[in-house]
């Protein structure tokens, strides 16, 4: 079983430690590596390839405001290659590592 599936139910924190939501689902690549984290509360996908898990939490290198304003995924039918591309671009434009290294070191 891929390790990322153990993230289900874990708290998601942003790069600064602010709570974002809870892992409701993890979408995997064909090789089992994590691709997207889905949080039901916000109905958004969060890129999982830079996520770090431990101590019952998953940390992602994005600010909560960026995640909260990401494109909404209302149904799995909307999870198309076009939606993924738009979502990937959304996060690429707003990625913030400034608090990431300091948060992980603490």
Per-region residue spans from a language model:
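Peripheral interaction segments used for macromolecular assembly
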Residues: 1-106
